[in-house]
């Protein structure tokens, strides 16, 4: 008796899944370049949130911290401890860089789950986390690579490049390849995890739009935070390694 309605509902769910857009982008033409508009829009929202939060945090500091000031001080202390653990005693100049990377990635990852996707109607695609676009993750990984090259070169000068022939010159190609694979691993790890998380949530919402996707969304928020921590930890570890020597 209920076979037909169930079949119709199943087909409707499959149809909704087939409508999930993967790799669809809304482009802006800027000069001779095409840029992903939805990535820029969400990135601007993330930057506005971070700048607004930072402004509020330093606007009226109290000797006895309020709840909000306590929170921001805890975040700063967490980033400082992370940088010191991975870089060592010379961590100070790198705290702003590591903190910026961590906070931008953290808020970007969460924006994909917390910002309503349909809040702004786009001709193509939907609003999503900036970090589910490979262009964003590569743009985050490349400054990290330049940072650890800069850290090693400023600390050791030309002798920094001696690490490529340690412990034996035979390993020169492998040591060079290792440095080139670091930004690749950083960018593809972050991109793959965030994209997969958002696709899983979209598919589950299409199939069972009520209760089932909620635990997956909470799991996605947790893993999004972990991915930001992993990226920042590895960035700090690479900088610390370049300053200490090849291991």
From Swiss-Prot:
InterPro entries named among the record's database cross-references: ATP_syn_F0_a_bact/chloroplast, ATP_synth_F0_asu, ATP_synth_F0_asu_AS, F0_ATP_A_sf
One MF term in the entry's GO annotations: proton-transporting ATP synthase activity, rotational mechanism
Signal sequence, start to end: none
Keyword set includes Transmembrane: yes
Gene3D superfamilies given in the database record: ATP synthase, F0 complex, subunit A
One annotated Gene Ontology cellular component of this protein: chloroplast thylakoid membrane
UniProt membrane topology term: Multi-pass membrane protein
Pfam families: ATP-synt_A
Major localization listed first in the record, in broad terms: plastid
Coiled coil (residue ranges): none
Stored NCBIfam families: ATP_synt_6_or_A (TIGR01131)
Family: Belongs to the ATPase A chain family.
Subunit structure: F-type ATPases have 2 components, CF(1) - the catalytic core - and CF(0) - the membrane proton channel. CF(1) has five subunits: alpha(3), beta(3), gamma(1), delta(1), epsilon(1). CF(0) has four main subunits: a, b, b' and c.
Protein name: ATP synthase subunit a, chloroplastic
